């Protein structure tokens, strides 16, 4: 009797804590482990997708929502929207004009979150890949190409003031793997 009641309570609690919000849009889930985009269609759709493994993580919806806003802000050159989903440390390192100049011709797409790990300090490490197109003049030094594939780890920190995760700075984000499309 007691075991059945405890199991039932645990099941209801787990369902309540981990069920998706009833009015939330469905999370795009990638069926493969990489994205291929036909030549000429780069960078691909601007939708942030997650792998099935990430979908099982309790924070997947928050991570997807924040990253979607992050990439939408870059693609639409909306600095204030970008600032709303990054930490104050990150936004202080990239003032408005630097953001606008740096992303002037950038379009990001084919965004896939592979993994979400928790760091010892409680922050997240989000492994993702995406494609970017940009003018050659705007391409990063050492990677002068109009189309790049990025594999990077974005740190995310909890912002208690806004009660949400935010993209952060840190050593995890400083060593992306970049190659031409």
What are the residue ranges of the model-derived segments?
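Exposed beta-sheet edge and beta->alpha loop/turn motif
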Residues: 1-2, 9-26, 121-181
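Intrinsically disordered, low-complexity, compositionally biased regions/tails
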Residues: 5, 36, 48-50, 113
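Core segments of small alpha/beta cavity-forming domains
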Residues: 42-104
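Short solvent-exposed beta->alpha transition segments
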Residues: 79-127, 133-138
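Intrinsically disordered, low-complexity segments enriched in small/polar residues
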Residues: 13-16, 68, 97, 101, ...
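Extracellular mucin-like PTS domains
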Residues: 28-41
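N-terminal functional modules and adjacent low-complexity/disordered segments of proteins
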Residues: 8, 12, 32-33, 45
């Amino acid at each position: 009797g007691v075991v059945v009641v405890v199991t039932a309570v645990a099941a209801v609690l787990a369902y309540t804590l981990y069920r998706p919000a009833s009015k939330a849009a469905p999370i795009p889930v990638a069926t493969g482990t990489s994205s291929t985009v036909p030549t000429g269609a780069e960078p691909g759709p601007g939708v942030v997708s997650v792998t099935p493994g990430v979908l099982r993580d309790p924070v997947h919806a928050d991570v997807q929502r924040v990253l979607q806003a992050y990439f939408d802000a870059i693609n639409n050159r909306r600095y204030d929207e970008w600032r709303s989903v990054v930490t104050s440390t990150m936004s202080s390192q990239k003032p408005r004009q630097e953001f606008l100049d740096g992303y002037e011709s950038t379009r990001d797409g084919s965004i896939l979150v592979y993994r979400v790990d928790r760091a010892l300090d409680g922050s997240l490490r989000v492994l993702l890949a995406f494609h970017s197109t940009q003018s050659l003049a705007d391409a990063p030094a050492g990677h002068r190409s109009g189309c790049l594939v990025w594999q990077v780890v974005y740190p995310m920190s909890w912002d208690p003031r806004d009660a949400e995760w935010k993209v952060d700075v840190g050593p995890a984000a400083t060593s992306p793997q970049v190659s031409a499309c």
